[in-house]
């Protein structure tokens, strides 16, 4: 089972999701489109175990973890930006 983390425009740059992830999937990256100047990105989605701790930790419901199977996974990986 593979997972992809979708990102939206409500990130406040608090880093709660990064700290909550037990697999070090997330990291903060510079992003001019938000107040904080940084957002959570998921460059290591292959390490995601789907525990959704990042979702639970997020105060703005910024992250959405979805499970994708087979070929759909590779098409969906581009959503982690």
UniProtKB/Swiss-Prot annotation:
- List ligand-binding residues for [4Fe-4S] cluster 1: 11, 14, 17, 58
Query: Per UniProt, where does [4Fe-4S] cluster 2 bind?
Result: 21, 48, 51, 54
- Free-text function comment from the UniProt entry: Apoprotein for the two 4Fe-4S centers FA and FB of photosystem I (PSI); essential for photochemical activity. FB is the terminal electron acceptor of PSI, donating electrons to ferredoxin. The C-terminus interacts with PsaA/B/D and helps assemble the protein into the PSI complex. Required for binding of PsaD and PsaE to PSI. PSI is a plastocyanin/cytochrome c6-ferredoxin oxidoreductase, converting photonic excitation into a charge separation, which transfers an electron from the donor P700 chlorophyll pair to the spectroscopically characterized acceptors A0, A1, FX, FA and FB in turn.
HAMAP family under this entry? PSI_PsaC
- A GO cellular component entry from the record: chloroplast thylakoid membrane
Per the record, the GO terms for biological process are: photosynthetic electron transport in photosystem I
Domain 4Fe-4S ferredoxin-type, first and last residues per copy: 2-31, 39-68
Q: How does it assemble?
A: The eukaryotic PSI reaction center is composed of at least 11 subunits.
Q: Which InterPro entries match?
A: 4Fe4S_Fe-S-bd, 4Fe4S_Fe_S_CS, PSI_iron-sulfur_center, PSI_PsaC
Cofactor dependency: [4Fe-4S] cluster
Q: Which EC number(s) does UniProt give?
A: 1.97.1.12
Top enzyme class, one word, equals oxidoreductase
- Lineage, highest ranks first: Eukaryota, Cryptophyceae, Pyrenomonadales, Geminigeraceae, Guillardia
Has keyword Repeat? yes
Its protein name is Photosystem I iron-sulfur center
Keyword Ligase on this protein?
A: no
Q: How is the cofactor bound?
A: Binds 2 [4Fe-4S] clusters. Cluster 2 is most probably the spectroscopically characterized electron acceptor FA and cluster 1 is most probably FB.
What Gene Ontology terms describe what this protein does at the molecular function level? 4 iron, 4 sulfur cluster binding; electron transfer activity; metal ion binding; oxidoreductase activity
